[in-house]
Amino acid sequence: MSATEPMIVAEGVSRVFGTREREALAMLAAGEDRAAILARTGTLVALNAVDLRVDEGELLVVMGLSGSGKSTLLRCLNRLVEPSRGTVRVAGREGTRMGARELREFRRRTFGMVFQHFALFPHRTVLENVEFGLEVQGIARAARRRAAEEALGLVGLAGWEDKRLSQLSGGMKQRAGLARALAADAAVLLMDEAFSALDPLIRRDMQGELVALQRRLRKTIVFVSHDLEEAIALGGRIALMKDGAVVQDGTAEGIVAAPATPYVERFVEHVDPAAVLRVGTLVDRGTSAARAGDARPGTPVVGPDGRLLGRAAAGGAVVACAGLDAGATLREALPVLAAEPDGVPVVDGAGRYLGVLRRTAALNALARRVPPPAEASPWTSPSPASPSTTSATPPSTGSPRMEPVLPAS
């Protein structure tokens, strides 16, 4: 794998289930829709020409309703489900061309999987479950035990090594499943609705723990979910699927601000925009800063390096003030903005002045009247990769445009 190649590259991946596969694929190539193909051939189109790229160390959430194809896509990545058409490359190797023995070895060393229903062995202890993947690989007992114990420590189960599964709660069992995947030190983690069976509070805890682990370990993770709130909490890129195709791919902020289709609009209509939209998207860049000594009172003042120093006061004085970080969410910014009628200066990660966040912009955002964010902006893309999947459905011409409705103040 070259330094610039994504960890996962899926190109034109289709999967159909039924006895008339060739006919169904021909109809698919001719532009027939899923329902027509099913009615004519009795063959179900599970995936329709999916293109997907996931960079090394990126967390991608694949979302959609039941039957949208998200779990089938996940299993096509490691060929647990055989693609009917298309190619999949992982770590520079094309799995769709591997023989059975090579594929088994590739799966063992490249992929870890975490399932919704744990898939643990009830007759084994926690430690024996976690070391199972290494045992299958033929790793020596002492080495695999060390790796399993380290993985259990990472997920907060140190001290539970010799317990039976019957002694664990649901959340602890899912931690054990995650530890099993981590112990194998796989480059790619495939997580299929891994937290869906957990109670809400435990689920949120597991989401936070996964985010913390990802920051530390920088694994490449493909996480399947049907819950947009979960996708937002995980903070990665989102690929949203419908009828076997990816209909929108981008950050949570980009999808909430500019849904590509009515289907996507329905997905995001109940999401709190204050929890998703970031200050850098809403900043008024037309408010210029000045140098100390020649600024009107209240004007942001910057130094020679463009860093915010404060606000100008009477007599040429500068009153220190902290700028809002462009990466902060609107929810984090609202308490500060409420105390500043003239708006709050916004700075980048290095403290350089970018502009001012105004109350009108915040109100427009809460009313979902914001311009679509630039997906490449550093404050809108927590994952290193930019969106790379083309929309399978064109933007709806009937969708409301995200334009400001209040005059700038």
Go through each PLM region and give its residues.
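Helix-to-loop junction immediately C-terminal to a conserved catalytic motif
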Residues: 78
